[in-house]
Every structure is written in C-alpha cells, then in structure tokens.
Swiss-Prot record:
The record marks K135 as: Lowers pKa of active site Cys. Signal peptide: none annotated. GO terms for biological process: protein modification process. It comes from Shewanella amazonensis (strain ATCC BAA-1098 / SB2B). Substrate binds at R71, G72, G73, Q74, V75, T76, Y77, H78, S138, L139, G140, G151, L152, A153. Catalyzes the transfer of endogenously produced octanoic acid from octanoyl-acyl-carrier-protein onto the lipoyl domains of lipoate-dependent enzymes. Lipoyl-ACP can also act as a substrate although octanoyl-ACP is likely to be the physiological substrate. Disulfide bonds: none annotated. PROSITE patterns: BPL_LPL_CATALYTIC, LIPB. Keywords: Acyltransferase, Cytoplasm, Transferase. This is Octanoyltransferase. It is an enzyme of class 2 (transferase).
Amino acid sequence: MQAKTLHIRHLGNQDYETVWHAMQHYTDNRDENSPDELWLVEHPPVFTQGQAGKAEHILNPGDIPVIQVDRGGQVTYHGPGQLVAYPLLDIKRLKIGVRQLVTHIEQSIVDMLKPYGVQAYAKADAPGVYVDERKVASLGLRIRRGCSFHGLALNVDMDISPFQRINPCGYAGLEMVQCKALGGPNTVNEAGEKLTLTFSQLLGYEHLVHHQGLAE
C-alpha cells in the first residue's frame, strides 16, 4: 500500500538552492519504505543550467543568478507566478522507467489543461508541454538509486520576458506561453491543485496526504 500514497508538500515561495539541497538529501537518505512525495513551490527569479547545458545558450542573464544543477536538460528560467513541481518517486517500486515517468508528467499537464479548453501536447523529440508550438511547461529530471528528483515548471501567471535572455532548453527563438494567456488556471495554487489530481491519478496513487513546508 505504501506506493499508493502520495505526500504533497506545499512549500510556498522558496529559494531554489534550499529546495534543491533538500531534494538531494531526501533522495540520498530514502529507503524502500520512504513515501513518494510531490513538492509544489514557487522560486524567486533564477536561471538553472542542466547537465547538458551549454554556456552559449545563456545570452544575457543580467541581474538574475545562474545556477549549475544536477538535472537533465539545458537552461531554463524559474520565477514568481510559475508552478514548479518536484516528484520524488521510487520508480523501481512503481515499476516504471524514466521515459514512462516523463510521459506521465507531460500527460498530467495535458490532462489538467484540457478542462479549460486548452489543447496542449507533448513532443517526442523535445521534452515539455506545448500549445500551438509555444512552450507552457518545461521538464528536467534526475534519477538516483532508482528514485526521481527535480521535475517540471509550468508557466501560470508570470513575467515571461526573462526567457528572452536565454535559449530556453537550448532552442534559440523558442517562444514561451503561460496558462493565464491561454485561458487556463490563473494562480499557482489553482494550477497546483489541478496538477496534483491528474498526476496522482495517472500514476495510480489512491491516497494524498498534504503537508505545509519542508520536513524538519
């Protein structure tokens, strides 16, 4: 039954590095009985450069910090008004592979936007979720000891202009879009609530347990 319970952590607005180090700590110290968790958070403005990232894709960061991190993928931007969700899952226990997890994450975003009349889709060759060739959600995962961390960023109601300072996910000229402009969820809380439901349903979790803040 353990694998059928998902713990949701509502972290509010938290510094990127604090949450990143907490994810690493949780993943490094978990065992076969540790619960799966989904962390929901907003970050202050920051560019994060994944392991495949190339310096030339960071065009003009200006006063926004750039952090080199241990996830897959290239450079992306996080900022207020964006829902960031980190699934900390034992994928061995769930009996799914990395590609399946990526597909489930993308599909959970597609499914949550559908009731708003937003026709979103994933692309086989470019992880993330798109609407009319514009990117609404970015993805970057890390698997360690059969467990996932890092995750997804969904643009909800934010200033998307900092994306113009980079080649998002390594694609020059890739246009970003956000939920509010599409008629989707207007707030990070609303988006988090809807995403939690579609994500947990797709992965077969039967019970959700909610927590405020990081574990002590």
